[in-house]
Amino acid sequence: MLNFLKKNSDNQEKTERCFDSSKPVADHIAVIMDGNGRWAQKRMLPRIAGHKEGMNNVKVITKHASKLGVKVLTLYAFSTENWKRPTDEVNFLMKLPVDFFDVFVPELIEENVRVNVMGYKEFLPAHTQKAVENAMEQTKENTGLILNFALNYGSRAEILTAVNDIVALAKSGDLPDEVDEKTFSSHLMTASLGEALQDPDLLIRTSGEERISNFLLWQIAYSELFFTDKYWPDFTTTDLEEAIGSYQLRNRRFGGLKDTTEGDA
Ligand code: V07
């Protein structure tokens, strides 16, 4: 009897969490694409095979997000901490933007996707920088989904860069006495997305970890968080719809008002 009740309530929860095409989708979705190495190890493959599979999934999820009407997809591709990984793995990762450019950019152009890259690009190898520049240049006229890669990105470093930029402005006498949220945000890397799209509505992390790991700390102040045990290469378009469905359900609890105060008393 108890089991029956439990099953019933699980089913109900699943139905409620379903994507609803009549409700607004999350405009800006950020993803921590975790679990590529573990996906490979589970299959007795080298970790780099997981990264390659993860890259293929970027294309699949981007296309589906674009179809659903998502405006920005921000993907954590390489963190400032990832340099500590074995040299061979880092070298392989640094080639992925090149591969991605060759294999997927023509398809994404057809899909009207614009590629943007934020992060400390100047520290990337020359061939990676070139691929990034090409991807951004060749898609700059596109007006559809913005595929925003965080590459050599770290949120604390981003915040400190913003502080230092503001200090430099203040020294040159170019700043009002007080810095407000809007001014501060305009110095963050997400400012390149345009004023309305800087903060993610929904943050997804795959692979079972429930941490933020130095990703968009300022920008996720009001974001809904969605964690799944699936490894990134196994994360499907249905999983994306489930994450958006969960966002739509939680958003509905605020009565359709854009809530910017903590707690929902
Ligand atoms: C990377 C594939 C996705 C899973 C997570 C880590 C590995 C796409 C890019 C990329 C970046 C910039 C760009 C075009 C493509 C990428 C890295 C790793 C370093 F302009 N996937 N992907 N870059 N992975």
Predicted features and spans:
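Flexible, compositionally biased loop and terminal segments
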Residues: 1-265
